[in-house]
């Protein structure tokens, strides 16, 4: 068997396959379907400083080769997570990573400070696609300045591995990635969902209550792959690739394009055991091509 281990900052993953936030609950929900310890890292549901109800229904819609979601970061807040969720997941022997969201820089900072004290959470992933309510609702992640502001503030209080999740809804994602790196990020993950919309022609109304939502699934893969390739060339920190990964071949393509690790999202809804199948598929690919380590294929695309 090939060596599948990779490093993301101070984080060591047994293999490069992770779960994307919002598609795998808190991990425990899937333990009857898959051996959680065979997953490189589990990124749990998005967590905010305070309780959030989420958006009204309908907030999910099927699209050709994908889906739209507008769940709205529904969660019970970080204090609830610490008191009720953390005790249930601290015994899972893999990297448990918390996705952190906020509507103001102070929200991110306070949430990160609280999570920093949890021994069995070795990393956080900042979702900077959230709107900044103090700046007219523009998402932090659509400008280098907005990205720098929140990443620097969190870096000042968070002492473990810091991953920054980038929005694809920008003109030049490399500019945002470089800003994250310069502000102290240990890694960047991309892409978050693409802004999309669905219409019910018979009712002449939007399908989603919020009109627009985040698009994910196989249809977004070419865009995600292109952005991962661009960012991997632009920064010197590990890149985590996601967006439309439905099987092992997709994962290998992302790694050839420069991703050190990958995340699986929408595919978890189709096959709860897809993560382990993908890691096994990567191993088979390495052995067929004579590689002894997965590191040998990172950025090995010949152009």
From Swiss-Prot:
Quote the pathway field.
Answer: Pyrimidine metabolism; UMP biosynthesis via de novo pathway; orotate from (S)-dihydroorotate (NAD(+) route): step 1/1
Per the entry, the cofactor note is: Binds 1 FMN per subunit.
Flavoprotein found in the keyword field: yes
Taking the record's annotation, the residue ranges forming a coiled coil are none
Known cofactor(s): FMN
Any one GO molecular-function label of the UniProt entry: dihydroorotate dehydrogenase (NAD+) activity
Q: What is its EC number?
A: 1.3.1.14
> What is this protein's function?
Catalyzes the conversion of dihydroorotate to orotate with NAD(+) as electron acceptor.
Q: Which family does it belong to?
A: Belongs to the dihydroorotate dehydrogenase family. Type 1 subfamily.
Q: Which named protein is this?
A: Dihydroorotate dehydrogenase B (NAD(+)), catalytic subunit
Query: Gene encoding it?
Result: pyrD
